[in-house]
């Protein structure tokens, strides 16, 4: 049973509050896919989190594309498409296809699949499909594909929830069960990465209370941080810098502009107003107090050691290095 009772902070008729409706939909975490198709005038590719399996026999999958997408006509005309599931080190690939570049495929490595659809190099998995059916669903077209070829690599998926990229980690309750099992075998020390994950869970939950009290969403908080002390940035630059979904960034920027916390500058760039800077400074002050409280019982020498260990970890060779 959950220890915390949750009450809705927004709700109602989705037609009168489409942004709130989209935020509610965004609470469901998904993976991140790039859907591709061949074309006479060049391949098409879009990011999509609407991917789902439909059937094992026959092997069917589906995804959907908005009618206003610039690639909609290409996918309507193509008899094939491929769904590429991104790994957790492919945020950059996702951002390329979510952005407005005219020649996205020149910015990533790819090869041609069995059906002629592009397959993204180093993707965690792919499903190469022939289009089985198309159905209209509101402002989207639902594409059903029959999988004729697939592939899977070892690794972890890139995740997406509430406008933010993420990674998959074991739940703390699962970690507790694993720790208990470790004790049975005399393995008393917690794995280093497990400790980092638990510290992140605690910090994020504690700071979420302050964000909510200030009326700021997680995406909004990151936008304030990204603009604070920075030259004016575009929505695309903010999304890349803070690892956020561009659409969520645009929505939050519009709300901040309406509230007077952000101002629109030349060339589609945005900057914090004095009100926005004050709001960010209040958050910094709270985080500083929170840090002091959490670390009060830890000696300066131990903090120094922990800091150096984490800095060395962050500066390490990274995934896939030999």
Curated annotation (Swiss-Prot):
SMART domains: Flavin_Reduct (SM00903). Keywords: Flavoprotein, FMN, NAD, Oxidoreductase. It catalyses: FMNH2 + NAD(+) = FMN + NADH + 2 H(+). It is an enzyme of class 1 (oxidoreductase). It comes from the Bacteria. SUPFAM superfamilies: FMN-binding split barrel (SSF50475), Winged helix' DNA-binding domain (SSF46785). Its EC number is 1.5.1.42. Residues 1-20 are annotated as: Disordered. One of its GO terms (molecular function) is riboflavin reductase (NADPH) activity. PANTHER family: FLAVIN REDUCTASE, FLAVIN-DEPENDENT MONOOXYGENASE, REDUCTASE SUBUNIT HSAB. Catalyzes the NADH-dependent reduction of the FMN cofactor of the nitrilotriacetate monooxygenase subunit A. Heterodimer of two subunits, A and B. Belongs to the non-flavoprotein flavin reductase family. This is FMN reductase (NADH) NtaB. The lineage of its organism: Bacteria, Pseudomonadati, Pseudomonadota, Alphaproteobacteria, Hyphomicrobiales.
């Amino acid at each position: 049973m959950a220890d915390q009772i949750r009450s809705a902070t927004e709700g109602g008729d989705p037609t009168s509050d489409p942004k709130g409706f989209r935020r509610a939909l965004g609470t469901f975490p998904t993976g991140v896919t790039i859907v591709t198709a061949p074309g006479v005038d060049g391949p098409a590719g879009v990011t999509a989190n609407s991917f789902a399996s439909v059937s094992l026999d026959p092997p069917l999958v589906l995804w959907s594309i908005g009618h206003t997408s610039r690639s909609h006509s290409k996918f309507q005309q193509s008899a094939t498409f491929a769904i590429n599931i991104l790994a957790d080190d492919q945020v950059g690939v996702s951002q390329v296809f979510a952005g407005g570049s005219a020649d996205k495929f020149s910015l990533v490595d790819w090869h041609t699949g069995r059906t002629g659809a592009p397959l993204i190099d180093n993707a965690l998995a792919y499903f190469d499909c022939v289009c089985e059916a198309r159905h209209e669903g509101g402002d989207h077209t639902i594409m059903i594909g029959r999988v004729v070829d697939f592939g899977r690599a070892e690794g972890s998926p890139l995740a997406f929830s509430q406008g933010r990229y993420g990674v998959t980690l074991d739940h703390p309750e699962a970690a507790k069960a694993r720790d208990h099992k470790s004790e049975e075998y005399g393995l008393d020390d917690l794995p280093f990465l497990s400790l980092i994950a638990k510290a992140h869970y605690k910090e994020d939950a504690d700071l979420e209370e302050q964000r909510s009290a200030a009326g700021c969403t997680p995406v909004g908080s990151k936008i304030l941080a990204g603009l604070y002390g920075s030259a004016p940035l575009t929505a695309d630059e903010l999304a890349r810098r803070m690892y956020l979904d561009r659409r969520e960034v645009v929505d939050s920027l519009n709300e901040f502009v309406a509230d007077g916390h952000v101002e629109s500058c030349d060339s589609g760039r945005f900057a914090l107003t004095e009100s926005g800077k004050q709001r960010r400074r209040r958050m910094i002050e709270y985080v500083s107090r929170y840090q002091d409280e959490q670390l009060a019982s830890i000696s300066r020498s131990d903090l120094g050691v922990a800091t150096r260990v984490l800095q060395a970890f962050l500066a390490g060779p990274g995934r896939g290095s030999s």
